[in-house]
Amino acid sequence: MNILLTTLISLVMTYEMPKLPYANNGLEPVISQATIDYHYGKHLQTYVNNLNSLVPSTEFEGKTVEEIVASAPDGAIFNNAGQVLNHTLYFLQFTPKPNKHEPSGKLAEAINRDFGSFENFKKEFNAASTGLFGSGWAWLSVDKNGKLHITKEANGSNPVRAGLTPLLGFDVWEHAYYLDYQNKRAD
């Protein structure tokens, strides 16, 4: 492949920061503007920049973040792609000042079917989140048969690697909560 075509492909397939659907202070008082500025503006931006510098001229050039996460071996490309995917899903899942605090419709039905109740789901999800040693993510995902699963993923891993579709992610890396909650992960 010639250099011009390679350059054009890399320009087209650059990974970008997601646009937040809320203001940086829109999640207060639960998540402060300082945390959003730091977590979104510094951490996620660094993962995006790293991924854009690592992928060109590799077998992953031209692939989506999901494809990279599903197929890349452990290492720098996987770690940065995983964190871009995880953080993108994380930041886009929030709604400032929601008027409902419980799921409804098909999601509520699936939670009741697979966990017995929303309360049971919350207990299991919180246990996964607080029980993960070190850094990582807790996820609610769905498999190809529609069954819900709670998983704990170390570091930058994602349920996509196991063929699951993530629905809800909770970042338990300290940078996600330390400015607001210090060492109180369970809060």
Predicted regions mapped to residue ranges:
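Feature for soluble, non-membrane regions of globular proteins
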Residues: I9-D187
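Sec-dependent signal peptide recognition
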Residues: M1-T7
